[in-house]
Amino acid sequence: MMFKQYLQVTKPGIIFGNLISVIGGFLLASKGSIDYPLFIYTLVGVSLVVASGCVFNNYIDRDIDRKMERTKNRVLVKGLISPAVSLVYATLLGIAGFMLLWFGANPLACWLGVMGFVVYVGVYSLYMKRHSVYGTLIGSLSGAAPPVIGYCAVTGEFDSGAAILLAIFSLWQMPHSYAIAIFRFKDYQAANIPVLPVVKGISVAKNHITLYIIAFAVATLMLSLGGYAGYKYLVVAAAVSVWWLGMALRGYKVADDRIWARKLFGFSIIAITALSVMMSVDFMVPDSHTLLAAVW
């Protein structure tokens, strides 16, 4: 029973979602030549770092979690694990994860993990989430770290491919998070969390969602235009982006914002999973014959 509680406090659903993006970034950079020990070290290392961040987040948020329907049954809120024990647990997970990334992958992968961790725990959870409407924007940077870590674990350098991945996954986080804030509007309101839909209104949030999906669409295409992913990826990226944008635009006419937002959120998971899978299997070796070079 205790094992279940220690697992729950790490938010396994979030870990799993991040692993899909790590695999996408790693296999995109590997280009068919997979270093399996490096692959395992990277996956386990990122999993432990994400788990650590989630436990710290649970510790920090335990006061506001009590006020939200979605989070009122979390392990720390119910007192199933003491706050002191959770801090030790989170620290040990983090140390193990960072060591695996440093020694098993490379220092760059580790430092990217540190940056994502500091942004999520130190900047977002401790301050921005409670005090600023821009908390989601800052938090999106940490959410985009895993695929970049996976990519840089292979390359050992932060190149334009890594920058494109950072842009894709950061931009994806915004409509994804705003959709959650709309269908969980009352929860965020009750906990006094200043997310955009609560502070500026749902209609403003819909405008932001539309603009971020357009920016996301452009960023996804850059992987193919830059010669990192192939035409199959390009077709899937375009199809996913157009469909997601269509869903966003239909939001201006819906009668029930909550139902619409839940569907938009659900498709965001499908979209990012599809992109992660396609970049894993439809990679290209960058050379002068990229689509971008052909255009110019």
Curated annotation (Swiss-Prot):
Q: Name one GO biological process term.
A: heme O biosynthetic process
Where does it localize?
A: Cell inner membrane
**Periplasmic topological domain:** 29-37, 98-107, 217-228, 288-296
| EC id | 2.5.1.141
Pathway given for this chain reads:
Porphyrin-containing compound metabolism; heme O biosynthesis; heme O from protoheme: step 1/1
GO MF annotation terms:
protoheme IX farnesyltransferase activity
Q: What class of enzyme is it?
A: transferase
Pfam families, alphabetically?
UbiA (PF01040)
What's its membrane topology?
Multi-pass membrane protein
Residue ranges that the UniProt entry lists as topological domain Cytoplasmic: 1-9, 57-78, 127-197, 248-268
Q: Name one GO cellular component term.
A: plasma membrane
For this protein, the record's InterPro entries field holds: Protohaem_IX_farnesylTrfase, UbiA_prenyltransferase, UbiA_prenylTrfase_CS, UbiA_sf
Keyword set, alphabetical order: Cell inner membrane, Cell membrane, Heme biosynthesis, Membrane, Transferase, Transmembrane, Transmembrane helix
Q: Enumerate the catalysed reactions.
A: heme b + (2E,6E)-farnesyl diphosphate + H2O = Fe(II)-heme o + diphosphate
- Membrane-crossing residue ranges in chain numbering: 10-28, 38-56, 79-97, 108-126, 198-216, 229-247, 269-287
Q: Which family does it belong to?
A: Belongs to the UbiA prenyltransferase family. Protoheme IX farnesyltransferase subfamily.
Function (record text): Converts heme B (protoheme IX) to heme O by substitution of the vinyl group on carbon 2 of heme B porphyrin ring with a hydroxyethyl farnesyl side group.
Q: What else is known?
A: Carbon 2 of the heme B porphyrin ring is defined according to the Fischer nomenclature.
Q: What is this protein called?
A: Protoheme IX farnesyltransferase
Give the species: Escherichia coli O139:H28 (strain E24377A / ETEC)
